Regions:
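Conserved alpha/beta-hydrolase catalytic His-Asp/Glu region
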Residues: 124-159
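Active-site loop/oxyanion-hole signature of alpha/beta-hydrolase fold enzymes
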Residues: 31-67
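Gly/Ala-rich beta-loop-alpha elbow adjacent to hydrolase catalytic centers
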Residues: 70-74, 78
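Catalytic histidine-centered segment of alpha/beta-hydrolase-like enzymes
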Residues: 210-225
């Protein structure tokens, strides 16, 4: 009997191998598909990253019965992919997708959008400085010392992303799809909480909160893995 198949979609700055390193133990129970998106090591730089185009790019990795899991920018991508590949997906999990427009009007969210726009429009030409500003803003840890070449490339790719807070994922269409949804947040930032609350309500999704790793919820390892495994096995 074939194992349930999970397609993991990473977010900004680091590639799939690093984002989902703590999920490798799940390979004992599931088939794991962990692509590195364009613009991330070991691939070359890119001129532009667009979440809708990335959803199209995922087609090559989607197969019947796929459980789709997206973190951060990968979560935004996955909200679009969930509609595009609805006939092939078994479930959808998103972890803190920065789709802030869906929660616009909430003062905390509006302030976060304004702060994010400043980080991009006033960004330093030095990728290291830009990356540190970004990581501080989203609630991720900032690496000490000189950044590795991989992180420098991640910062360059980050700078050419289509702003995720402009995304308008087709939530009504996504809500109408037959597969279950899981929305996870890290209990560190009320703006991300607000987005996840909207997704829970609009999609009829299961909601989970896993504190302890800030925005980088998958780095928790076992708590996230246990949650994801139980959700997928329930819907296999």
């Amino acid at each position: 009997m074939s194992r349930p198949r999970i397609l993991f979609v990473h977010g900004s700055v680091v590639n799939g191998d690093l984002t989902w390193a703590a999920q490798r133990p799940l390979a004992e129970r599931f088939e794991l598909v962990i692509p590195n998106r364009r613009g991330f090591p070991p691939g070359p730089d890119v001129d532009r990253v667009d979440y809708e185009d990335e959803a199209d790019w995922l087609e090559q990795f989607v197969a019947p019965g796929t459980h789709l899991v997206g973190h951060s920018y990968g979560g935004v991508i996955s909200l679009f992919a969930g509609v595009r590949y609805a006939d092939q997906l078994r479930s959808l999990t998103v972890v803190e997708p920065p789709a802030f427009r869906i929660a616009a009007g909430d003062p905390v969210v509006d302030d976060y959008i304004a702060t994010s726009e400043r980080i991009w429009t006033e960004r330093s030409d030095d990728p290291s400085e830009f990356l540190r500003s970004f990581l501080h803003g989203v609630g991720s840890s900032t690496p000490p010392g000189e950044l590795s070449p991989a992180l420098i490339q991640g910062a360059r790719t980050l700078a050419v992303e289509r702003y995720p807070w402009t995304a308008e994922p087709p939530l009504d269409e996504l809500a109408a799809t037959p597969f279950p949804k899981l929305v996870v947040s890290g209990a560190h930032n009320p703006a991300f909480d607000a987005v996840c609350d909207v997704l829970e309500r609009r999609l009829g999704a299961t909601r989970a909160v896993l504190p302890g790793a800030g925005h980088s919820v998958p780095r928790l390892g076992a708590p996230f893995n246990d949650l994801l495994a139980a959700f997928i096995e329930q819907n296999a």
